[in-house]
Design a protein with these regions (language model features):
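Membrane transport/envelope proteins' first extracytoplasmic loop
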Residues: 2-269, 278, 332, 337, ...
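Short cytosolic juxtamembrane segments of multi-pass membrane proteins
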Residues: 3, 376-394, 756-771
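Short helix-loop junctions at transmembrane helix boundaries
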Residues: 317-354, 698-765
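Juxtamembrane segments of multi-pass membrane proteins
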Residues: 62, 405-546, 550-553, 558
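Hydrophobic alpha-helical transmembrane segments of multi-pass inner-membrane transport and secretion
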Residues: 15-44, 248-288, 306-323, 354-366, ...
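Short coil/turn motifs that cap or connect alpha-helices
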Residues: 138, 296-297, 379, 550, ...
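Short, membrane-interfacial amphipathic segments enriched in basic
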Residues: 1-7, 392-408
Length: 771
C-alpha cells in the first residue's frame, strides 16, 4: 500500500519553496565550484604529468661559453644522453620586462600553441600566454625594443617553462616582468648575436627510476661533460624550478576546497535541522495524530528527511553538471593565471563525484536524522498537547520589571531562539572567515612589500656563481676557470662588502624541506648590525616566525642531498622579513663548512656593481627580486579573492535569511495576536526584526576576534605548504570596519524581506492552535 505521507511532500515543497530554493541554489554554487575545481585540478595535473612524454621535456640543460663542435658533441652523447641545441637570447623590452627568445623547438621541449599561429618569418613572434595576459597583450599586438619591433602571431606554452623562472636560483617565478617567446630561425639570426647563450638540452638514453638515482646519474654526467667542454651552468630536471615547481604546487589547494564544501554542507544541514524542528512544532498536532494512529517514529523521520536529502541530491547532481561545464573553465583559468600550462582534456574524476555528491548526502542524512530523532522522542500525547518541554518543565529566565516592556519582549524572543542564533553565529563566522581571507591577503602583501623596502640588508646583494667548468673532470681547464673567476670577481666599488654564502636545508617533516641561506659577514659589517662574536648564530625574523624559533633554541639543518647534519644555537633574531637565513661571522662560516680562509660568495652594496662580468653573477637580490613573491601571489590569487568576496556575502545572506524566516514563522501566532491588539507592522518589526538585528550585530562583533585566531592558523598552514620563504600575516584595522559594514549592509537586505513577511502574517493565525 502506498504511503499517504508521500502526498504531503509536494505540498510541503510548495509551502516552503523560498527556503528550499535558496538552499538549493547555495548547494549548486558550492558543489559546482568544488566539483569544477577538482575536475580542473585532476585534468590539468594529468596533462602536466603526460606533458613530459608528449612534449619530450628535457632531462636537464647546460650552458657553455662557446658552441659545441661535432667531436665534442659525440663525446658528450657517448655518456648516455641525446643532445639538442636550445640556444636563447635575452632582450630588455620597452615595457620594462625581459624576453627570452628561442627558435621553434621540434624535437625536445616542444611548444603548445594556445592561440593564433606560430611565427613563420621575420618580425613575427609567439609569446608565452601567461606573460601576455599579465601584460595585457594579445595576438596582433606589437612588442617593441628601441627601433626593433615584433608582431605577436600567437600565444604559446613552452613545456620547459610551466613556471616562468628567469633564474633557477630565484625564490619565486615572475610572469609579469619575465617572458619566453618563439621566433622563426631567420628572425633569431637577426637578434643581437652577442647576447647568444649556448644552451643545450639532454635526454637520457635510459631514464633514472627516481630522484635519488637521477641525482647520481646527473652528477656523473656533469663530470663527463666537464671533461669535454667548459660548463657555465648545469641544471638537471629535478633541480629545474621552471619545470618542477608547477607539479609540486598543483594539488595543494585540494584539501582547502574540500573543507570549504563540507563546512557549507554542515551549516546547511543544521539550518535544515532547525527548520525541521520548527516544522515539527507547527505540525505537532498532525504528528501526534499520526503517531497515535500507528505511524512509527522511523516512518516520520524518513518522511521529514526526504525533502532535505532530495534538495541536497538535486543540488549535488546539478552542481556536478555545472562543475564539468561552467565552473571547470573558471577553475582552470585560475591555474592558467598562475602557470604557463599547455592545453588539457577534461577527464572523469570519480573522487570529485564521491566527494561532492555521496559525502554531502551522507552528512545531511546523519545530521538531520540526529535532529529528528531527538525532536520526535516526545510521546503522541505531548505532541497533541503541543507540550515540547521534554522531561522537565523549563523555567523562563527572570527579567526585571524595571526593564521596559519592549526590551523584555525582545529578550524573550532571543532566549526562545537561542539554538537558531547559535547556528547563525557559526554561519556568520564562516562567511566572515571567507571575507576576511579575501581582504587579508592583498593588505598583507602590500605590508610585506613595505616592510621589505624598509628592512633590506643592502640595496643590492650580488650572489656570485662559480662556473660549472671549475668542477669539470678536466683538471687543467678547471684550474684555469677558477683562476679566471677569482681574478674577475674583484670590484673597485667602495660600497661593496664581501660575505660568504652557503645553504642548507631544514630537516624533512610534515612540510617540504626548505632551503636556508647562510650569510658569513665581516665582524665590523656596515650592513648587518648584529653581535656575531658569540659561538651561536643569528637568524632572520622570517625564519624565526615560520618555524617558531626563539632565542636560545638550537636549530638542526642538513645538506640538501647528503646525510650530513649541522646544529647551531640561536644567539639572537635579526629583523629581516625577506628571507629565511642565518647570520654568522665570515671566518666562522668558512671554517664550519670547510670553504677555505679567503672564500667569499657575494657582495653587499648600496650602489650597483658594474665591473664584475655578468657570467659570474648568479643572482642579484634587490627590491624587485625580494618583492617577486608578493607580486606573483597578487597576480595568481587576484581572481580567487574576488570569488571569496562574493561567496562569503552569499553564504551570509542565505544563513541569515533562513534563520530569520524560521524565527518569524515560529512566532507567527504571537505576531498575529499583537496585530489583533492593535500594534502596527512597524512596532512588531521593532520586537522581532530588531531582536535579530541586535543578535546579528553582536555576532558580527564577537566573530572578529574568533576569526582572527582561526585565520592565524589557516594563514600559517597556507604559507607553510604553498610557498618557499615566509610572509607574516598582517591585519589592516580597516578590514574589521569593512567586514562589519558589509555584514550590516547584507543584513539590511534580509531585514527588508522579513518586514514584508511580518506584513503578510494574517490576524486569524492567532485563532489557530488555541490552547
Amino acid at each position: 500500500m502506498k504511503n499517504p505521507l508521500r502526498k504531503r511532500i509536494p505540498r510541503e515543497l510548495k509551502g516552503e519553496l523560498g527556503k528550499y530554493l535558496v538552499v538549493f541554489l547555495l548547494m549548486v554554487l558550492t558543489i559546482g565550484f568544488v566539483s569544477g575545481f577538482l575536475v580542473a585540478d585532476g585534468s590539468m595535473l594529468k596533462a602536466y604529468n603526460e606533458s613530459f612524454d608528449k612534449y619530450n621535456i628535457e632531462n636537464g640543460n647546460f650552458r657553455t661559453a662557446e658552441k659545441i663542435y661535432s667531436s665534442q658533441w659525440k663525446g658528450i652523447e657517448a655518456a648516455g644522453v641525446k643532445l639538442y641545441e636550445n640556444y636563447y637570447i635575452e632582450e630588455d623590452l620597452d615595457n620594462g620586462s625581459t624576453m627570452r627568445f628561442f627558435k621553434n623547438r621540434e624535437k625536445v621541449n616542444k611548444v603548445c600553441l594556445m592561440k593564433g599561429e606560430m611565427p613563420s618569418g621575420q618580425g613575427e613572434i609567439a609569446i608565452d600566454r601567461m606573460y601576455a595576459d599579465n601584460n595585457s597583450l594579445k595576438v596582433g599586438d606589437t612588442l617593441i625594443r628601441g627601433e626593433k619591433s615584433w608582431k605577436i602571431t600567437g600565444l604559446v606554452a613552452l613545456s620547459d617553462y610551466s613556471a616562468l623562472f628567469q633564474n633557477n636560483n630565484d625564490s619565486m617565478f615572475d610572469s609579469v616582468k619575465f617572458g619566453v617567446a618563439i621566433v622563426a630561425p631567420e628572425e633569431f639570426e637577426n637578434l643581437d648575436q652577442e647576447k647568444l647563450r649556448y644552451n643545450y638540452a639532454w635526454i637520457y638514453d635510459h631514464q633514472p627510476k627516481n630522484e635519488k638515482e637521477e641525482k647520481k646519474v646527473s652528477e656523473n654526467l656533469m663530470e663527463d661533460i666537464g671533461k669535454v667542454v667548459a660548463l657555465e651552468t648545469f641544471v638537471p630536471r629535478y633541480l629545474n624550478q621552471a619545470i618542477i615547481f608547477t607539479g609540486d604546487d598543483m594539488g595543494g589547494d585540494r584539501a582547502m576546497v574540500i573543507t570549504l564544501l563540507y563546512i557549507v554542507i554542515v551549516i546547511m544541514a543544521f539550518v535544515f535541522g532547525i527548520t525541521i524542528s520548527n516544522t515539527i512544532r507547527k505540525e505537532a498536532g498532525v504528528i501526534g495524530t499520526l503517531r497515535a494512529s500507528g505511524y512509527t517514529r522511523r516512518e516520520l523521520i524518513l518522511h521529514y528527511m526526504t525533502l532535505p536529502v532530495l534538495v541536497t541530491l538535486a543540488g549535488a547532481l546539478i552542481g556536478n553538471i555545472l562543475g564539468y561545464t561552467v565552473f571547470k573553465g573558471v577553475c582552470a583559468d585560475m591555474y592558467y593565471g598562475s602557470y604557463s600550462l599547455p592545453t588539457y582534456v577534461t577527464v572523469w574524476n570519480a573522487d570529485a563525484f564521491l566527494l561532492t555528491t555521496v559525502v554531502p548526502v551522507i552528512i545531511m542524512i546523519l545530521i538531520d536524522h540526529a535532529v529528528l530523532r531527538y525532536r520526535l522522542q516526545l510521546s503522541p500525547l505531548k505532541l497533541l498537547r503541543r507540550d515540547f518541554s521534554g522531561k522537565k518543565q523549563k523555567r523562563a529566565v527572570y527579567l526585571s520589571p524595571k526593564i521596559g516592556i519592549f526590551s523584555r519582549f525582545r529578550l524573550r524572543v532571543i532566549f526562545q531562539n537561542v539554538s537558531s542564533y547559535l547556528v547563525l553565529f557559526v554561519g556568520v563566522i564562516f562567511a566572515n572567515l571567507l571575507l576576511f581571507f579575501g581582504m587579508l591577503l592583498p593588505s598583507t602583501l602590500d605590508h610585506y612589500q613595505m616592510e621589505i623596502q624598509e628592512n633590506m640588508l643592502a640595496k643590492y646583494q650580488y650572489i656570485l656563481s662559480v662556473p660549472a667548468s671549475a668542477y669539470s673532470g678536466n683538471k687543467e681547464d678547471a684550474m684555469n676557470s677558477l683562476l679566471e673567476y677569482y681574478t674577475d670577481i674583484r670590484t673597485d666599488n667602495k660600497d661593496a662588502e664581501k660575505f660568504s654564502a652557503y645553504s642548507l636545508n631544514t630537516m624533512p617533516g610534515k612540510y617540504k624541506s626548505e632551503e636556508i641561506a647562510f650569510y658569513g659577514v665581516e665582524p665590523d659589517s656596515r650592513y648587518i648590525q648584529a653581535d656575531l662574536s658569540g659561538d651561536g648564530v643569528y637568524i632572520s625574523s622570517a625564519y624565526a616566525d615560520k618555524f617558531r624559533i626563539k632565542e636560545g633554541d638550537t636549530i638542526t639543518l642538513k645538506e640538501k642531498y647528503e646525510k650530513d647534519e649541522y646544529s647551531f644555537k640561536v644567539d639572537g633574531i635579526y629583523d629581516y622579513a625577506a628571507s629565511l637565513c642565518v647570520f654568522m661571522e665570515r671566518d666562522k662560516l668558512n671554517e664550519a663548512f670547510d670553504l677555505g680562509d679567503d672564500y667569499f660568495g657575494g657582495y653587499f652594496s648600496d650602489t650597483e656593481i658594474k665591473d664584475i662580468p655578468s657570467k659570474y653573477i648568479g643572482s642579484v637580490i634587490d627590491l624587485e627580486a625580494l618583492t617577486k613573491i608578493s607580486r606573483q601571489l597578487d597576480v595568481s590569487m587576484g581572481d580567487m579573492m574576488g570569488m571569496m568576496y562574493g561567496f562569503s556575502v552569499i553564504i551570509f545572506l542565505v544563513v541569515i535569511y533562513l534563520l530569520s524566516k524560521v524565527i518569524i514563522e515560529k512566532n507567527a501566532q504571537s505576531i498575529s495576536m499583537t496585530k489583533i491588539l492593535g500594534y502596527t507592522n512597524g512596532e512588531i518589526s521593532r520586537l522581532y526584526i530588531l531582536s535579530t538585528s541586535l543578535v546579528v550585530v553582536f555576532c558580527l562583533l564577537l566573530s572578529l576576534p574568533v576569526e582572527r585566531q582561526i585565520m592565524e592558523v589557516l594563514f600559517r598552514e597556507m604559507m607553510l605548504s604553498s610557498i618557499s620563504g615566509w610572509i607574516t600575516m598582517w591585519v589592516d584595522p580597516m578590514i574589521y570596519v569593512k567586514m562589519t559594514a558589509i555584514g550590516i549592509a547584507a543584513y539590511a537586505v534580509v531585514a527588508v524581506l522579513e518586514f514584508r513577511r511580518i506584513r503578510h502574517v494574517p490576524m486569524d493565525e492567532a485563532l489557530k492552535n488555541v490552547e
